[in-house]
């Protein structure tokens, strides 16, 4: 079981021959406040240092889409007479009668009316329209994405990406903008997909969390704030990193502390998760989705 924040700080102060505190959060001692800040800094640095298995998280979510009807007026931004606009916002793409490609909800005017980001190309009454959410929030503890883990679990297809800016605009603006495979990119700190779904799909990917701290109730946190908080990272690494940073900030000689820290950090990395067994006669790598496993008939069905 991991030490809590109080125990970690007490270990640091004991090893540095400083006054050992009885509490950390709210402690007026400048040394305690500084050690708390440095321990958080050590955590932030360690998050970026390595793909710790304790910080690797699977993220899953369902896409949202609704097909309904609306009225359009040529040359205006207004879609009216929608049965309900509940839940719609600017993260929804619009595909429908007289609605140009790559059009999004701009504002929700009332329970039956919205404005869009592009002008309607013609006038119609009761035309079909699909509102599809293509922009999704990243998890609150998101640090970085894990490559090649993005899947449409409903269709059992890997999602393609990250798409660069030029490809993205080509997909959203070109004549051929849709296909059976979903593309993705991270834009504006949001997870975006294309083309828009017209049905609910189950998507997922893995990411590295920056939540190296856990509240006593199990809630993931990005910093130590309470004495009962624990870390999912190695306690000894946290103690050694904090001691090293304390000496650095005081302009003390850090040679010995740095050697101890690097030595133990390398051990912690080596022991953090298993490694693949390497063969002197390896077989071809596993095929994901390609020509080798696309059926001759019934493609996409």
Locations of regions flagged by a protein language model:
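Glycine-enriched, solvent-exposed interface loops adjoining structured elements
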Residues: 1-73, 86-100, 104-107, 111-120, ...
